[in-house]
Structure formats: C-alpha cells, structure tokens
C-alpha cells in the first residue's frame, strides 16, 4: 500500500488545479478504485491460483489451464488500468509544476527590475513583457494558476487520453474475460491428456466485483466526457467575454449628440412660404421657425414680388419682339398671394383672380388726343 499512498499524494495535488468535474473524477478514483482495490478485491482474489482445481493428475495441466483461462489476473489488470488512467493527470500536474517554476523565476526577475526602477532606470518595457508572460502561462495574482493557453490544452489532452484508456481497457477486459465468471472451465491443452474440467473458487463474489469495477469505469468515462464539454464551452465563453471586454475598452459608449438632428431653417425676411412641411427625418417636437403671414411686411413683400414678376415678364416679351402679341388672361394673372383669411376662403371656393388692368398714367394731351387713332410703336394692342 506504500505505492498507492505515493500515487494518492501526487493526485491530491491535482485537486487545486482541476475543475469541478476533475475533482469528482479524482474522488471516484480514490474511493471506488484505489481504496476498494486495496482492501476488498485483493482479498477476494488472494487464493485465485491455489484454489483453481482440475479433474486430472497430470503434472502441469492445472498451470496451463489456469494460464489459458486467466492470461492476467483481474487485480493486476485493474492496477494497470488505474496507472494508465492516472498518467495523463500526472502529466498535467507536471505542466502545473513547470508553470509554478516559471512563476518563481518571473517574480524574482520582476523584483530585480522594480529595484532598478527605484534607482531611476527605465524598465517599463521589461515589466510589461513579464506581465505578458504571466498572462501567457495563466499565472494570476497571489500565485493562483488559471487554465488558459498551453495549460488549458494540456488539460484537454489529458481528458482525451483518460477517456481513450478507459474505453481501451473496457474492450480488453470484455475480450479476455467477459464481465462474468463461470464456476467450471473446460480445458484441452498440452500436457493435459484429454479435455479436462477446471473449477474456480468464489465465482459469484468475483463476478460482483467485476460488475462493480465495470460500473465505476463507465462512471469515470461519463465524467470525462462531461468535463470535456464543460471545458470546451467554458473556453468559448471566456473567449467571447474577453473579446467583449476588449471591444468595450477600445470603444466607449456612443451617446447621441444633442446638437445632431435635422438642420434648422429660417426665413430671413420673416415671412413664411405658403406651405412649409416638416422634414420627414425631423425629430419629434421639431418646428420650423416661420414668420407671421398676416404681418404687413409680408403682404408688402408679396405685392412687390408680384409687380416685379410682371415687369420682368413684360420686358422679356419686348426683347423678343412680341410686344404686339396679345397677352392671354392666363399669362396676365398677377403673382398674388392671399393676405387674409377672407381671400383664402375665396380661393378655396373656386374664385379666380382677375387680371390686372393696364393703366397708362401719362396725362393726355391735345396732340395725343388728335393722334390717338394713329398707332404708336410702344402701344399695346388690345
């Protein structure tokens, strides 16, 4: 049992660097395998070969029949299984010790650099490199080791190898023994003179232990699979969380500016247009700053604009040599705007605006009255 205690001490150190599933797996390994194998199973198989009897007196026949029936003892087979299953965990523990050794070296170097920094040396870049190496090895504050990077890969590989060894030993056991023992074995092998019957002691008790160890192996395999999925999804979650933290650290929260929005429009003459629709992208509560259309300045502005438009139109007709053409009523309509509510109602009711009469304000003279019948080049034909 001295060898079992040494293995137990090594596996006990893995507890501090394992996940919850790994700790449960180690508990199953200690209690239901190592402890049970060292107490009950060895005593059940203690008289295995001495109690194996065959119905022959031929020397050496019992030995060859026992070797054919049991190529390897169940106890030794389970010991090999425990050792092979524990080796990946011990390799992971060796990696943890390597990381801890690296931590000691980095801490010692960091202390030396801090002493040099107090003396005025510029060692900020070297300290930053040490922090990066600690993060790479998974070393956190207070000497705590976190599974990331190479340490996480080693842990996943150890779980995979443990699962492979569990399946391999279960298949080997099924191929060699099966999962039950019979009371009588027939043997026909030299130097036995003929086919002989051999008898096994306590086959029922041994069958119970075989089934129990089979169940423990299946439970350990299930724990390995669950732990593998747990580590896989936890790694994805940590990676997504790390990217999210990096994104929030590099880009601050975007808050909409109060100054943003639709541009403001203003009529500098203080008069509003006939229709001033709001912008389709204007925010709620947004209103155009418009002037009062009933204001006298607005009415004067509309009249002046109408007169100017009419004068421009007449000048254009004269330049084109169409001064003698008849102006239609539609062209002669002034550009007038309703200046009060009553005119607006008339427009809505369908009243048309009358054309402005062209009044010649020049005083009539005798010559003009005499020559009124003669056309002048600047007169308009009516």
Swiss-Prot record:
What the entry says about post-translational processing?
A: Phosphorylation at Ser-325, Ser-328 and Ser-330 by CK1 modulates gap junction assembly. Phosphorylated at Ser-368 by PRKCG; phosphorylation induces disassembly of gap junction plaques and inhibition of gap junction activity. Phosphorylation at Ser-368 by PRKCD triggers its internalization into small vesicles leading to proteasome-mediated degradation. Sumoylated with SUMO1, SUMO2 and SUMO3, which may regulate the level of functional Cx43 gap junctions at the plasma membrane. May be desumoylated by SENP1 or SENP2.
Entry-annotated residues carrying Phosphothreonine? 275, 326
Membrane-traversing stretches = 24-44, 77-97, 156-176, 208-228
Question: What ranges does the record list as Polar residues composition bias?
Answer: 317-332
Query: Residues bearing Phosphoserine?
Result: 5, 255, 257, 262, 306, 314, 325, 328, 330, 344, 365, 368-369, 373
- As stated in the Swiss-Prot or TrEMBL entry, residues carrying the post-translational modification S-nitrosocysteine are 271
Per the record, what is one GO cellular component? mitochondrion
Q: Which residues carry this modification: Phosphotyrosine?
A: 247
- Enumerate the subcellular locations listed in this protein's record, separating them with semicolons: Cell membrane; Cell junction, Gap junction; Endoplasmic reticulum
Give UniProt keywords alphabetically. Answer: Acetylation, Cell junction, Cell membrane, Disulfide bond, Endoplasmic reticulum, Gap junction, Isopeptide bond, Membrane, Phosphoprotein, S-nitrosylation, Transmembrane, Transmembrane helix, Ubl conjugation
Please verify whether the record's keywords include Acyltransferase: no
List residues of cross-link (Glycyl lysine isopeptide (Lys-Gly) (interchain with G-Cter in SUMO)): 144, 237
- By its UniProt entry, which SMART domains does this protein fall under? CNX, Connexin_CCC
Q: Where is this region: Interaction with NOV?
A: 244-382
User: Region Interaction with UBQLN4: start and end of each range?
Assistant: 264-382
Q: Where is the composition biased (Low complexity)?
A: 362-374
Question: Could you tell me the membrane topology recorded for this protein?
Answer: Multi-pass membrane protein
Region (Disordered), start-end ranges: 317-382
Similarity comment text for this entry: Belongs to the connexin family. Alpha-type (group II) subfamily.
Subunit organization: A connexon is composed of a hexamer of connexins. Interacts with SGSM3. Interacts with RIC1/CIP150. Interacts with CNST and CSNK1D. Interacts (via C-terminus) with TJP1. Interacts (via C-terminus) with SRC (via SH3 domain). Interacts (not ubiquitinated) with UBQLN4 (via UBA domain). Interacts with NOV. Interacts with TMEM65. Interacts with ANK3/ANKG and PKP2.
Which PANTHER family does the entry link to?
CONNEXIN, GAP JUNCTION ALPHA-1 PROTEIN
Q: What does this chain do?
A: Gap junction protein that acts as a regulator of bladder capacity. A gap junction consists of a cluster of closely packed pairs of transmembrane channels, the connexons, through which materials of low MW diffuse from one cell to a neighboring cell. May play a critical role in the physiology of hearing by participating in the recycling of potassium to the cochlear endolymph. Negative regulator of bladder functional capacity: acts by enhancing intercellular electrical and chemical transmission, thus sensitizing bladder muscles to cholinergic neural stimuli and causing them to contract.
This protein is called what? Answer: Gap junction alpha-1 protein
Recorded source organism is Erinaceus europaeus
């Amino acid at each position: 049992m001295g060898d079992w205690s040494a293995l137990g001490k090594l596996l006990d150190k893995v507890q501090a660097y394992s996940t919850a599933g790994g700790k449960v797996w180690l508990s199953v390994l200690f209690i239901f395998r190592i402890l049970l194998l060292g107490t009950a199973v060895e005593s059940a198989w203690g008289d295995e070969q001495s109690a194996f009897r065959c119905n022959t007196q031929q020397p050496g026949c019992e030995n060859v029949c026992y070797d054919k029936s049991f190529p390897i003892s169940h106890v030794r087979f389970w010991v090999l299984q425990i050792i092979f299953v524990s080796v990946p965990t011990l390799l992971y523990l060796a990696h943890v010790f390597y990381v801890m050794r690296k931590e000691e070296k980095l801490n010692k170097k960091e202390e030396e650099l801090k002493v040099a920094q107090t003396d005025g040396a510029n060692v900020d870049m070297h300290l930053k490199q040490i922090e990066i190496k600690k993060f790479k090895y998974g070393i956190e504050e207070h000497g705590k080791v976190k599974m990331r990077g190479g340490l996480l890969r080693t842990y996943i590989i150890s779980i995979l190898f443990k699962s492979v060894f569990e399946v391999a030993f279960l298949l080997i056991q099924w191929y060699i023994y099966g999962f039950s023992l019979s009371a009588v074995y027939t043997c026909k092998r030299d130097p036995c003179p003929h086919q002989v019957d051999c008898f096994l002691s306590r086959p029922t008790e041994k069958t119970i232990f075989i089934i129990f160890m089979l169940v423990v192996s299946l439970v350990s395999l299930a724990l390995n699979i669950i732990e593998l999925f747990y580590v896989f999804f936890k790694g994805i979650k940590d990676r997504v969380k790390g990217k999210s933290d990096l994104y929030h650290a590099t880009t601050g929260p975007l808050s909409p500016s109060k100054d943003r929005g639709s541009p403001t429009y203003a009529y500098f003459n203080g008069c509003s247009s006939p229709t001033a629709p709001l912008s389709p992208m204007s925010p709620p509560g947004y209103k155009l700053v418009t002037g009062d259309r009933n204001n006298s300045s607005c009415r004067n502005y509309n009249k002046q604009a109408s007169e100017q438009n009419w004068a421009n139109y007449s000048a254009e007709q004269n330049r084109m040599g169409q001064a003698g053409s008849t102006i239609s009523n539609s062209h002669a309509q002034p550009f007038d705007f309703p200046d009060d509510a009553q005119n607006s109602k008339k427009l809505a009711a369908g009243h048309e605006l009358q054309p402005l009469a062209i009044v010649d304000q020049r005083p009539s003279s005798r010559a003009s009255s005499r020559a009124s019948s003669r056309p002048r080049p600047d007169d308009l034909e009516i």
